[in-house]
């Protein structure tokens, strides 16, 4: 879908809300995949629904002068790492890795994102952020290495 929109576009972010421990969307969850087109200066989002259906959205780029209201960091097109890693683990592997560092009974993943939040261990690089319904959030590197809690 992304390459049909713009062959030069690059994926910049993956974000899941209300995800099962197996990595699949719950009945009220969804996965979002965002791409950036330098040529068009626009974002392209694919929202994958639990039933397998999807929605496609095109959005303008944020104002280059925009800044995060908490960190005061300039907002770029989207995503932490500007170069997507050549290889990266999928959400199922990232969730399993994070679960191995979590105590207590877990029921779901409230949020799972790749290249959306920055890890202090690997600044400027893509990492998974996994947040369960109980306990802390966890950073997992693109290579599957556990990076710590957040």
Language-model features: locations:
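Long, terminal "pre-/pro-" and other extracytoplasmic accessory regions
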Residues: 1-150
